[in-house]
């Protein structure tokens, strides 16, 4: 998983397909405490080689892209596929840690930062 350029660059990259624009805000721990694994049911994202999330931190600062490389293991549910609610809005791997400087990093486990991030859009290819 790698961090790349600011969110607005992703609209210029035609190799990515838009999956959804959830605009859902996640707080510390949401990925696991409030979610369920949906990898098996979500074939579009499960079968994608790469998934990209455009996120912003508290108040919309520091837009960041998180790119998740799923080429090595598409069967894994841990750190690859969780949901942020019991509804139908699913996203591939994300617990978010917001660092002290306000930037967002994707992580398998949320750190004890107590901040929140907003997932603005999800792309795949």
Residue ranges and their predicted role:
Residues 21-47, 58-65:
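Surface-exposed ligand/attachment interfaces on beta-rich extracellular proteins
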Residues 52-62, 125:
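Short, flexible beta-strand-to-coil junctions
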Residues 71-89:
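Terminal beta-strand-rich extracellular "head" domains
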């Amino acid at each position: 998983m790698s961090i790349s350029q600011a969110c607005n660059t992703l609209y210029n990259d035609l190799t990515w397909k838009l999956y959804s624009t959830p605009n859902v805000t996640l707080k510390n721990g949401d990925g696991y405490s409030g979610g369920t694994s949906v990898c098996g049911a979500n074939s579009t994202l499960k079968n994608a080689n790469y998934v990209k999330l455009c996120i912003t931190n508290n108040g919309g600062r520091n837009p960041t892209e998180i790119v998740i490389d799923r080429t090595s293991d598409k069967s894994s549910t841990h750190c690859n596929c969780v949901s942020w609610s019991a509804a139908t809005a699913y996203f591939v791997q994300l617990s978010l840690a917001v660092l002290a400087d306000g930037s967002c990093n994707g992580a398998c486990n949320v750190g004890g930062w107590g901040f929140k991030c907003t997932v603005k859009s999800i792309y795949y290819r």
